[in-house]
Amino acid sequence: MQATLMVALGGAIGSVARYWLALLMLPISRELPWGTIVINIAGSFAISFFGALTLEQGRFPIPEIWRLAFMVGVCGGFTTFSSFSLQTMDLLRAGQPGKALFNIGFSVVLCLIAVWLGLLAAERFNGGIEQVAQNVIEEEAS
């Protein structure tokens, strides 16, 4: 029950942060959903960086409940894959397949790069990218 409450609290924080950032990005989001793109890239970096640093074997290990609160709650509430999907479909339905493909490619590639950069940044704290990657794999398997 405590974990559920922590995830819910994290989700509320992430959702509000997403809303505020999307509002800040509105002036430049006329042609493409830049707020959603930036949010997904930032969330991809945050989940990998925080996740790698806070593993039991990481530089800053923390209790699992706090990892859940941030990774499932905050990052889950903050990132916007459903919004990304809907906005891409809206571009397609508006007869703008080029913009839709750009949105897909740009978002996916930069989110993958953000995850990679998050892992590299965590490497500085944890002592080697191979160890970070192995720790993440082991954590996911358990």
UniProtKB/Swiss-Prot annotation:
The chain crosses the membrane at residues 5-25, 35-55, 68-88, 100-120. The gene is fluC. Keywords: Cell inner membrane, Cell membrane, Ion channel, Ion transport, Membrane, Metal-binding, Sodium, Transmembrane, Transmembrane helix, Transport. InterPro entries: FluC. HAMAP family: FluC. It is a multi-pass membrane protein. GO terms for molecular function: fluoride channel activity; metal ion binding. GO terms for biological process: cellular detoxification of fluoride. The keyword Transmembrane helix applies. It comes from Brucella anthropi (strain ATCC 49188 / DSM 6882 / CCUG 24695 / JCM 21032 / LMG 3331 / NBRC 15819 / NCTC 12168 / Alc 37). This is Fluoride-specific ion channel FluC.
